[in-house]
From Swiss-Prot:
A Gene Ontology BP annotation from the UniProt entry: L-arginine biosynthetic process
EC number assigned by the record: 2.3.1.35, 2.3.1.1
Site keyed Involved in the stabilization of negative charge on the oxyanion by the formation of the oxyanion hole: positions: T126, G127
Catalytic activity: N(2)-acetyl-L-ornithine + L-glutamate = N-acetyl-L-glutamate + L-ornithine; L-glutamate + acetyl-CoA = N-acetyl-L-glutamate + CoA + H(+)
Annotated positions binding substrate: T162, K188, T199, E285, N407, T412
Function: Catalyzes two activities which are involved in the cyclic version of arginine biosynthesis: the synthesis of N-acetylglutamate from glutamate and acetyl-CoA as the acetyl donor, and of ornithine by transacetylation between N(2)-acetylornithine and glutamate.
Subcellular location: Cytoplasm
Name used for this protein in its record: Arginine biosynthesis bifunctional protein ArgJ
Subunit structure: Heterotetramer of two alpha and two beta chains.
Gene Ontology molecular function: glutamate N-acetyltransferase activity; L-glutamate N-acetyltransferase activity
Amino acid sequence: MRDIETIDTLNQLNIDLQGDVSSPLGFIAGGLHCGLRRKKVDFGWIYSTTPATATGVYTLNQFKAAPLKLTEDSINKDKALQAIIVNSAIANACTGEKGMQDALDTQAWIAEQLNIEQHLVGVASTGVIGSFLPMDKIQYATQHVLKEQYNKSEAFNQAILTTDTMTKHLSVKVEIDGTTVTIGGTAKGSGMIHPNMATMLGFITTDANIDANTLDYCLKQSIDQSFNMITVDGDSSTNDMVLCMANGQAQHTQIDALHPEWHKFVYALNFVCHYLAKSIAKDGEGATKLVTVKVKGAHDVVEARKIAKSIVSSNLVKTAVHGEDANFGRIVTAIGYASRYIEPSATHVSLCQVSVLEKGMAVDFDEQRLKEELASDNILIEATVGNGEGEAAAYGCDLSYEYVRINASYRT
């Protein structure tokens, strides 16, 4: 799958599933093992050869981790970053003043190593909550950032992982003003995933020339439709965020909402965010199936999103999917408690393109055919809930015995 390069001819998008955050002009990514984990790469970086316009979206969890708060404050100074540092294994969350000082020290060491201003360094951590970082190991790692033998983007893609079973990355190219613009993305996430930013880190880079306000708007719109529409287990974490850097090294007229081809950039960014979000959902802890829920006919898009999230978050729906059980009553129940604007007599539900509910009433269907469809590793649930114009899609996974095993022994 990752060796495929495709072209979306309709939208003039070149898609490289081997690409990542190092694909756009002027970006370098790398990683190394500094001893936070037993053997695996655990410290990574993204560096732009020139300062980049930057924006981010952050967890809604009230226990925000120190590195997240520091990065948010740093970006707010002048909407720019030049480097991002990430460690896995330890979240540096619920660590008080020492945790914040550790994040500040990491930021300062990187700024000195790269000879850049301190506020241009973003810091991110992911892993076990409540443990302090071994700062001697972190300092060692910062002294090796950008050394040639470690500047391998796949090392960065690996360094940010926790319980993930695979790396998640791609890049896309689109023509703007006759110039090739590249957007690259790398993400991590497998458990503690729920809408409105959860246990996931997402990093997006681009060589596009785009003003800060437009970049911020585009990223937030894309995340509302992608990262905020995935769930694995309903838990939202303390650390996690999506950061986007645009260094402007592609030579084209600056993009803003009035640019005649700005829709191309928006489409490309949406594609990257959706691909990464679905990759996280598919790699949910213990997951065996990707679940896609599409809702239409809702009162508005807000209600459509609530209903789609309700279905994909339901543990009863998730366990039925895992058991390949055509128990559509669980889907109907999740629709019914999600919104007060549901029109039961105008509600239709299909499971794997097999109609199971029409006008609010169960219908006969081919049980054997549906059983065969449910054996697939990609499950589609579609629901029309009325005659409104609201549409939305959400992504999740099944809930398996393996999920319990992984999370019962996470610290051990």
